[in-house]
Amino acid sequence: EIGATTSTFGYDDSMRRYLAATGRQDVVNAADKVASYLTADSEVYANPEKYFDQLIEINLSELEPHINGPFTPDRGTPVSKMKAEAEANGWPIKVEWGLIGSCTNSSYEDMSRAASIVRQAVAHGITPKAEFGINPGSEQIRYTIERDGIIADFEKMGTKVFTNACGPCIGQWDREGADKQEKNTIVHSFNRNFSKRADGNPNTHAFVTSPEMVAALAISGRLDFNPI
């Protein structure tokens, strides 16, 4: 959504284990025969700056959660600076809705991480200040998160479970009051947040962030809430 057209991941042990664990041993067997052609040469890994136009190294232990938006996914703000940024730009601080799912950030792992935040809130008797909804990424995801009690965790907090579809990400959301076109803020884990996309309201300030952050912001009901 911010300009990349292609991304590649070299074949390695992690990919091999994943393919085997998901019933694709035949793919593993075929890939193992040409494994050296499915990843970069050793010289590239040793000196990547010699082979690429730009090398970006990210230390995950130092990475701060970001909230992107509104109206574009390439405007990122660290959570520690969101309060000042929102005040400077007149963005509505109150979060009306938190949405997780669609095709992006709706895997079993995504849902389970968000549910861990929800469980902590429920255990402490905290109720969400914003409306909260999830779209499972597929029927398999819906089935497994229901089987493992994750949907029940969400429902204990009053979360609305939508169908396994694109949902609000492509405007399949009959949001009550959207026709009034009032200025408001929503946060979601969808990868697109362009004007009018979710609910048809050009004044809806949609922000993109991780499933965990969506859960935290929906519970707090504030865009400037910093959970870290």
Show the residue positions of the predicted features.
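Fe-S-dependent hydro-lyases/dehydratases of central metabolism
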Residues: 1-228
